[in-house]
Each structure stands twice: as structure tokens, then as C-alpha cells.
Amino acid sequence: MEEQSEILSSKKEFAFATSTILSQVGRGIMVGLLVGLIVGSFRFLIEKGFHIVQGFYQDQGNLIRNLLIIFLLYLFICLLSAKLTRSEKDIKGSGIPQVEAELKGLMSLNWWSVLWKKYILGILAIASGLMLGREGPSIQLGAAGGKGIAKWLKSSPVEERSLIASGAAAGLAAAFNAPIAGLLFVVEEVYHHFSRFFWVSTLAASLVANFVSLLIFGLTPVLDMPDNIPLMSLSQYWIYLLMGIFLGFSGFLYEKAVLNVGKVYDWIGKKVHIDKAYHPIFAFILIIPVGIFLPQILGGGNQVVLSLTEQDFSFQILLTYFIIRFIWSMISYGSGLPGGIFLPILALGSLLGALVGVICVNLGLVTQQQFPIFVILGMSGYFGAISKAPLTAMILVTEMVGDIRNLMPLGMVTLVAYIVMDLLKGAPVYEAMLEKMLPETASDDGEVTLIEIPVSDKIAGKQVHELNLPHNVLITTQVHNGKRKTVNGSTRMYLGDMIHLVIPKSEIGKVKDLLL
């Protein structure tokens, strides 16, 4: 019976590998519609809830009453978080490392449990005023939705991974109104290559989810910047070089902090004898003073980014905002509540860019009208360095601000920041988070699957028998000049060809590292 099941699964995988573009687009549309509704409503409820909480803090006339309401809300969220995270630990944090782990065959999420628990607790946690982003949870919710559709369709493992990737990209697209960035994020951060197995359905899902989001929120870009920002002359481009170096170093410091904040929480928890499930209470207690005195900088950070181009801030105020948001972003994320670092990183990057911009304006190097470009460049460079996904950073910021004229400066700053981060031996932040959680989540159930990867320059020109593949990995077919042929030990690999491998799910990441 088990052998028949494996044969049926293998037939499904090879059928999916040869499926038409139209069928893959159809699956992508299904995922996009579902994820667009899930993430669109998730985003809508977070925005409404956050405005209510922020309003309580801003209503200074009834502050005592409002603080009592806020305290009761925070207590409820803390108790609910303890209950839900004990029953489903994979809803903690942003969720992006968990999605990466699933796509690499290192774990298998209970899609329904993750979906409804992350949805409810994510809305409450992110709307509470903590400096958490909605984008990481949106990606995990999208991935869970994609897996749900795969289960409903009784898909093969390879098709299931394709739909999970499509859902993840659709989640980012709906959260940021950035469909192309959604596709690129999955390519750069998860797959590290283009594969027909997933990119067609992923793009379709991203576009459809974005369309649903636009129906809910309108056509205005998420971070709508002033029109007609004067471009800087070529003689001023040295500023971009220095800015990229600055953002690269700053990104490295951020990564070190965010990867170690959990240790601080564990140390404090042991000192005061509070169970890990109740660590969010520290974040809630510490966010209250910020809410009382600076309610305008609460939340994920999109309000902060927009305010930088609408008001004139001094260097001292910008530096104060950055320090507070940096520290409280760590406090918020380290609590383990559902919520991401995506938008908080962009907000911190915009503040760093604004700091550079203020210095340049005060020194007479640029005009005040050119100041907004520094806010935009700060977001792209800072996120590109921390994530080590420069293409995603550039396109994401471009889609969010709705202006493509800044691609050259964006590319320069982001590339320099990325290079500095690499020279400092900084790892992609989500991969580093995945490494930290692997001992808890890694699984090896021996289940095999089919994957498709391109022939890289690492293996181009070699014959199959020269690749030294693990004994449980088999290359089955090669697609050369659009024609599919069966592979044997003497088959030569040509750069740009696609090869199909039958492989244990738990070995996906290892084999990709070996061949790509």
C-alpha cells in the first residue's frame, strides 16, 4: 500500500513537472485570490486596531482611564499568546524562517493551526502599538494558505512547495502592494534561482493578491512620496557611495542585535522567574512610556516614514527617534509575539537616510527639495544589507513609493551596502534566524520529492558521475535547448540547462548548496 502511494506521488510530481503554463497560472490565481482576502483583511484589521490603540495614547485628557484599558488589553494579549504559542510554536516571530524551512524540506507546518492562530494573535500583537511589522506574518499566512490549497487539490510534494512559495509571495504582495518584490523575495531569499516549477504560479499569485489588496485599500502606494523629487547630479554621486557604506555597517549592527535579543529575554526571564511563554509582558510594560510621550512613533513604522517627508525634523529629533525605535524594535521582536522586522527595518532605514539627508542639507551639499530621496535610499540600502536581498530591496521600495526614477541611486546605495555587509561576514538575517531555530524544527522523515534547479557554473561542463552526489540523490532528466532527455552517468551538464532531481526533502538545502 505504501509502495503504491509512493508510485502515485511520483507520477503526480512528474505530471506537474510537465504541466502547461496555463495550468500553473490557474493554480497561482487560486492562491492569489485566497491569500489576497486573508492578508487584505489581516492588514485592514491591524490598521483599524492600531489607530484605536494610538488614539487611546493620544487622548491625554482621559489618560488614566485609557491606560487602564490598554493595560487590560495587553494582559489579555499576553495570556492568549501564552496559550496559543504553547499549542503552536511556529506562529512566533515573523514566520519567514519557518516558511524557508518548509520549502527546504526541513519542517512541515500544520497549515490550518498556523493560519488561524497567527491571524488572530498577529492582529492583536501588531495592532497593540509594539514596533512589529505585518509583512513577515503576511508571508507566513500566505504560505499557509498556499499549503491549504495544495492539500485540497491533493497535490504532490513538488507542487505543494510551488503553491507554498506562491502563497508566500502573494502575502508580501498584498501586504505592501508590491507584486514583483513578492516574486523576487522568494527567488532571492528562499530558492536562490529561477525555476519554472514555481515562478509562473508565484507571479500570477502575487499579481492577483495585489489586485485584491488594491480593491480594499485603493491605488495609492503604501509609502506615497512627494512627486517630482529633483534628481541629484552625477557630481553628487559620491554621497551615495558614502551612504551605502554607512548603511552597510548599520545593517551589520542591527543583525547582531536582533539575533541576540532572545538571549537577553532568556536571561531576564530566569532572573525574575517568568516562563518564556509570558515574555511578551516585558515588551508591553516597556512600550507604555513610549506610547504616552511619543505615540506618533508607535507601530510598524509606516507613519514614521511618511512623516519624514511631510515635516521638518532636526538632527537631534531624528537621532532620538532612531535610537528609540531601534531599541524598542528589538524589545518587541524578542518577545516572541507574532510580528515581523520587515517594516521596522524599513522605518529604521528611512531614519538613517533622513539623518544623512539633514547633514547634507545643512552642509549645502544638496537642496531641501532633494531630501526625500535620502529617505527612500535609506530604506533600500538598510533592508538590502540586512536581508542580503538587494534586488528585492530595490524593487520593493520602488513599488512602495510608486516612483521608478530613482532606480540608479537605489541600485548604487543598495549594492554598496550589500558589499559592506558581505565583507563584514554578515549573513542574510532570515537564514541566520533559520539556523538558530533548526535544532528545534529540523525533521527527516525520509520522504522523497522532485526538484528542478539550473546548471550553474559550478557544475557546467561536468559529467553526472563527476558531481559526487549523495547516494540518495538521483538526477532523472535534463532540459537542454527546450528538449527533455533522460540522464545517465556520462551525460554532460551545460550552463543554463535545467535538471530534475529525485531527492529526500530533508536534503534539498544541502544539495542546492552543493550544486548552485
Predicted region positions:
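Cytosolic Rossmann-like ligand/nucleotide-binding regulatory domains
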Residues: 459-511, 515
